[in-house]
């Protein structure tokens, strides 16, 4: 199914079950995901806890009509007349919100490690009269719905920057479909996913990688004990292993030949690491660079890019992959529950 078809399936679920709000504490992005199906403006008093006028003023509006007009105009949908709203008309749209690691918004990259985005999906009809949806997004966002409506931008599938946001939206929608049992996808073939992952990253000892993955699934206590004996972890008898830590320290970090560093990256050491991995000289300037700036330089001068293994500490665990394989590697990482993120 296409993204629009999946969203329409979720809309059918909403209308069939009369469930208009969704909250998932754990999403594929590592943080909560919220979604609400609005009848606007009928749902606004409840959605704003009767603080609608406060939020309207905060967003620079004086009435409910103006933000709706702005939203629909940006979506290339003819707005209703003010009279239609006064007469009790309501208009429908989805708002899907979540945080994700490694911001896409250039204004956030230098100062934050997460980005809070709101997607607005408006039911409509296409030029052929078929049911469809217009997709918009707002980032950064403060959670004020009226601001989100006024600041939203129409997603363009032909724009490279928007493609990254569309990929996030598709992953969020797939997650919702799975949780709501809406045309649930076929079970993930873990063996095939592991094979593809190790092949794309050219992991030399594929058998050892798969063996360690299985050990984490089957005997995590033994994996933790091995790390304790090697001096990489502290634990007492009976401690329950953190699987995310095991995936990082027992599997990914040693098998991906990663470059591990604290938040202050040594450009000379990283230059040497990158030169060895990509097979040609690559030199970074001495001045401090943000990780995304390093990635931009690497991508400009080679076919490679950098990804990061989330360590849940104030540090990086970087590894190299081909630019053309980045999207697929991130998809496989989510399937395998690997905390791998882009910059």
UniProtKB/Swiss-Prot annotation:
It holds the Pfam family DUF7821. InterPro entries: DUF6630, DUF7821. To P.multocida PM0657. This is Uncharacterized protein PM1082. It comes from Pasteurella multocida (strain Pm70). The lineage of its organism: Bacteria, Pseudomonadati, Pseudomonadota, Gammaproteobacteria, Pasteurellales.
